[in-house]
């Protein structure tokens, strides 16, 4: 009888010990999950920049995972559906337009990281002033991009926009003077624009720097006009669901992406086609 009781006591102790180990492991797994962040990003330059940030975040005990996207719609859908923790591909005016169209999206800007000056390309003409009467300008199907594009044309004296207008909110409908009677075709998906340019379609094609880089174009040398990077409101940002901007992983991500190491990488790698920002 004593032997049976002794065996039972040992067995009970073993069960409790295993249970305790199980509890400890579970807590460790939970802690590890809290130290991971999954970020959705465009291939170039966003995912490349994030790859450089991986070891720096690892030093802070954070595992960065990257999921790449090829368009400008799915990254926000994935964020809303909690498939990713953050995304890195869009600028503030674009985010504002997305939130206006999707009031159920509760997103915030967690921090600006870099600027990609947009370029206007042409195989037929050397400047915007050389564009012919009744010419066609092909651009991306994003209303939030129209203001920045039209501002370049206005700066070159090709068109005029309404006075007193917030240029980031300007659209094709705000053109008040267009002496060349240019047609602005804003119906094209952004990823197709480099191919349209290479096919010599239209008189000018507006291409975002990320798509240009992905297609092997030089966003500084190849365009006939380039947007200025100074006082540029189109900084690409880390976007998260509201409330997550205060999470340790998100704060660390923004801090690392704004670090000297990453800023130096951006400057050296993209040579002005992508410009780092620090605030």
Model-identified regions with their sequence ranges:
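Short, well-ordered beta-strand elements
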Residues: 31-44, 62-68, 136-137
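Bacterial signal peptide processing site
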Residues: 22-24
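A conserved helix-loop-strand patch within extracytoplasmic ligand-binding domains
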Residues: 110-159, 263
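Beta->alpha turn/N-cap motifs
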Residues: 44, 71-72, 82, 87-96, ...
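Periplasmic-binding protein-like
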Residues: 111-121, 145-154, 213-255, 257-279
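C-terminal motif of bacterial Sec signal peptides marking the signal peptidase cleavage site
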Residues: 16-20
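Short helix-initiation/N-cap motifs at beta->coil->alpha
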Residues: 67-77, 166-195
């Amino acid at each position: 009888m004593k032997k049976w009781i002794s065996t039972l006591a040992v067995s009970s102790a073993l069960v409790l010990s295993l249970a305790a180990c199980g509890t400890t492991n579970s807590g460790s797994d939970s802690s590890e999950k809290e130290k991971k962040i999954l970020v959705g990003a465009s291939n170039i330059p966003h995912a490349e920049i994030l790859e450089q940030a991986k070891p720096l975040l690892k030093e802070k005990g954070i595992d960065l995972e990257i999921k790449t996207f090829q368009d400008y719609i799915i990254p926000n859908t994935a964020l809303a559906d909690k498939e990713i923790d953050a995304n890195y591909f869009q600028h503030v005016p674009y985010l504002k337009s997305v939130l206006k169209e999707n009031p159920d999206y509760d997103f915030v800007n967690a921090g600006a990281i870099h600027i990609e000056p947009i370029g206007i390309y042409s195989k037929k003409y050397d400047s915007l002033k050389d564009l012919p009467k009744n010419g066609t300008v092909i651009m991306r199907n994003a209303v939030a991009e129209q203001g920045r594009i039209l501002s370049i044309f206005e700066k070159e004296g090709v068109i005029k926009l309404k006075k007193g207008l917030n240029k980031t909110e300007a659209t094709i409908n705000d053109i008040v003077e267009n002496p060349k009677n240019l047609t602005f075709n804003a119906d094209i998906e952004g990823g197709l624009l480099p191919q349209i340019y290479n096919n010599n379609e239209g008189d000018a094609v507006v291409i975002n720097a990320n798509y240009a880089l992905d297609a092997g174009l030089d966003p500084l040398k190849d365009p006939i006009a380039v947007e200025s990077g100074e006082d540029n409101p189109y900084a690409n940002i880390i976007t998260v669901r509201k409330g997550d901007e205060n999470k340790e992983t998100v704060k660390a991500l923004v801090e690392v992406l704004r670090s000297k190491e990453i800023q130096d990488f951006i400057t050296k790698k993209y040579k002005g086609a992508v410009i780092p920002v620090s605030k």
